[in-house]
């Protein structure tokens, strides 16, 4: 199979679809890998590293897309849509439930798109989303602490406090991978941490994991309102695989927060859980203030720590990339149920129910689509 690794063009997206070691594994399996010039430089992988791994370095973006399978990190931007072609396998994060124009382009061009974030194991875990959820979760507490500083627009709160002064209050909505990792760092900074989740069993697990050092609260509108308004930092970490994130924090709740408090919306790439995160921000201009509250809504948080993120992502995605390349997509989907759940569009059809419902499009199961 011929595989392309393009350079990411999203604002300050410094990750790359495969590291040189991943490229080497594909080449050793008999595949041809094209890597766009400087695709890995943001993660401190140079062209010579890829060349030594067996890749062909190409300067033309169009050439790196003219392949059987493209492996990326983030969803394609509009300038990349013209490279879509029938039968192209696109393997990347997509978050299509918040990307109607991209969804339509994939359908129109009959692209076979596989979203990292919807590959799902029998225990409902998300193996290709998990590494970046860990990174984004850990970053969210660090970023929140930074923007609570007065010079960054915050109220001037030190999360850990000092003797005689209360700790900062951190509320995390969602106790999955991102929320759990946010709690780890917030606790490490010395904050007073509360996690809200809808699953009582998960709350019990979190209580055991943290040895009672975090407050675990059932997530419902009343409790969300109560804890949001008294928090210095609120982190939104709710995920419904493939679907838009629920708007759990209303504008009225935000209005009740203290001036200079901070919200971090990790779920912004799926639409966000805060009513007031009505726009996606970038690493160049990461925040805006609304109702006196600092809003951070960067959709590619792990792009700020690309070396760690690329290596972690490569560890997770490479086995699936090898499966697609070695077996071909049809056999790979048939032999691996978790991978088949990653299929979002197939030759003009939407094969993810959450995406179909988001845009009122016709849905076909993977099994139905593969028979066409």
From Swiss-Prot:
It holds the Pfam family AlaDh_PNT_N. It catalyses: L-alanine + NAD(+) + H2O = pyruvate + NH4(+) + NADH + H(+). GO terms for molecular function: alanine dehydrogenase activity. Its EC number is 1.4.1.1. It is an enzyme of class 1 (oxidoreductase). The active site is at residue 95. Pathway: Amino-acid degradation; L-alanine degradation via dehydrogenase pathway; NH(3) and pyruvate from L-alanine: step 1/1. One of its GO terms (biological process) is alanine catabolic process. NAD(+) binds at residues 169-199. The keyword Oxidoreductase applies. Keywords: NAD, Oxidoreductase. PANTHER family: ALANINE DEHYDROGENASE. May play a role in cell wall synthesis as L-alanine is an important constituent of the peptidoglycan layer. Belongs to the AlaDH/PNT family. This is Alanine dehydrogenase 2.
């Amino acid at each position: 199979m011929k595989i392309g690794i393009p350079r990411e063009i999203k604002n300050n997206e410094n990750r790359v679809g495969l590291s040189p070691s991943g490229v080497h594994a594909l080449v050793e399996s008999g595949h041809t890998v094209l890597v766009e010039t400087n695709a890995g430089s943001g993660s401190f992988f140079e062209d010579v590293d890829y060349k030594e791994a067996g890749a062909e370095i190409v300067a033309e973006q169009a050439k790196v897309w003219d392949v059987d399978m493209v492996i990326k990190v983030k969803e394609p931007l509009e300038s990349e849509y013209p490279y879509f072609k029938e039968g192209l396998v696109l393997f990347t994060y997509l978050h299509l439930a918040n990307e109607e124009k991209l969804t339509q382009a994939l359908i129109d061009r009959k692209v076979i798109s596989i979203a990292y974030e919807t590959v799902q194991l029998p225990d409902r875990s998300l193996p290709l989303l998990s590494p970046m959820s860990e990174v984004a979760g850990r970053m969210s507490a660090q970023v929140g602490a930074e923007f609570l500083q007065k010079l960054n627009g915050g109220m001037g709160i030190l999360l850990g406090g000092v003797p005689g002064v209360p700790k900062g209050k951190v509320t995390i909505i969602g106790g999955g991978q991102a929320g759990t990792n946010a709690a780890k760092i917030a606790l490490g900074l010395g904050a007073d941490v509360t996690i809200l989740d809808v699953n009582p069993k998960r709350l019990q697990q979190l209580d055991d994991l943290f040895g009672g050092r975090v407050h675990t609260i059932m997530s419902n509108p009343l409790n969300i309102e109560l804890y949001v308004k008294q928090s210095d930092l609120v982190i939104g970490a709710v995920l419904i695989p493939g679907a838009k994130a629920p708007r759990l924090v209303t504008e009225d709740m935000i209005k009740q927060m203290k001036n200079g408090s901070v919200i971090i919306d990790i779920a912004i790439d799926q639409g966000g859980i805060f009513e007031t995160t009505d726009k996606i921000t970038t690493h160049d201009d990461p925040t805006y203030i609304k109702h006196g509250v600092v809003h951070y809504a960067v959709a590619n948080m792990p792009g700020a720590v690309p070396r760690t993120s690329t290596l972690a992502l490569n560890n997770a995605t490479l086995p699936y990339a090898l499966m697609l390349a070695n077996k071909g997509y049809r056999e790979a989907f048939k032999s691996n149920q978790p991978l088949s759940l990653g299929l979002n569009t197939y030759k003009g059809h939407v094969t993810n129910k959450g995406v179909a419902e988001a845009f009122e499009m016709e849905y076909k199961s993977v099994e139905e689509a593969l028979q066409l």
